[in-house]
Amino acid sequence: MLIDKFERKIDYIRVSVTSRCNFRCLYCMPNTPFEWEPHENILRYEEMFEFLRLAIDEGINKIRLTGGEPLLRKDLDVFVKMLHDYRPDLDLALTTNGYYLKEYAKKLKDAGLKRVNMSLDSLKPEVAAKIAQKDVLNRVIQGLDEALKVGLKVKLNTVVMQGINDTEILDLLEFAKNKGVTIRFIEFMENERAYPGVKRVDSKVILDKIAKKYKFKELPKDNSASRYFETEDGYVFGIIEPHNEDFCKSCNRIRLTAEGYLIPCLFFTESYNIKEALREGNIQKASEILREVVANKPEKNDWQDEEVSTRAFWETGG
């Protein structure tokens, strides 16, 4: 079992299988030229699996595959099956922008994937295109429908931004409610790689907008990053607010980047390279690094301090 120095049980790892993405979302991707990491620099599936097998044996029971856009990496369903076959009761999830989900949903479900989180930042084609910097909405909704059709559990994520999509909060909630899926509204997380001028909408403003139409109550907090609320007619939606001082209290996760770095906290610059140990087949060293990462997991993010990570979310797995 993995326990950090603040007595938090670490049982969840987010694994970025690629830093590449086919979107250029305003709140995530850099607004200056950059180069993708060469393929030879990223971990092979076999290397990821060797580490994750170790992590599972140490107490990890939830794995979320992220990116970048994870569906850009070939044979993701094969990797999912490797993990599922090793531990069939593993909570295997995927975070995706949904663009390729229509093509891959059934393969992933058949391989053992259980859940999908999808980005849906607008229901207006022109606004969705402005945010992602390409025409995406139709394909994203097709991906959502296919995921539901094959039996995947789905949540929608919406990053709310001032003057861009903050007038759509109720429309997005209604859309998710009609689809029978949970939607989570996310406060924009300031980072140096986002486009200038993108501003967050405070969670209180989001809740006030919803309260104009719905009465709701807050549900008891679990160890997720979200606060959840239930409307009088039984619909559940969520809020993710990294600016809240309680955001980190029950954090149970660490992150592995595609390039082979273990990260104890999304908002810190510290990272631990396990690629060399994995390529040498040194599982003992990889185990030691895993325990070091857990031991050095901070109590909370330094959101208001200068130490906040400048690492891009698309590099880290968000």
Curated annotation (Swiss-Prot):
NCBIfam families: moaA, PRK00164.2-1. This is GTP 3',8-cyclase. [4Fe-4S] cluster 2 binds at residues 248, 251, 265. Monomer and homodimer. InterPro entries: Aldolase_TIM, Elp3/MiaA/NifB-like_rSAM, MoaA, MoaA_NifB_PqqE_Fe-S-bd_CS, MoaA_twitch, MoCo_biosynth_MoaA/MoaC, rSAM. Its EC number is 4.1.99.22. PROSITE patterns: MOAA_NIFB_PQQE, RADICAL_SAM. Its cofactor is [4Fe-4S] cluster. Catalyzes the cyclization of GTP to (8S)-3',8-cyclo-7,8-dihydroguanosine 5'-triphosphate. Pfam families: Fer4_12, Mob_synth_C, Radical_SAM.
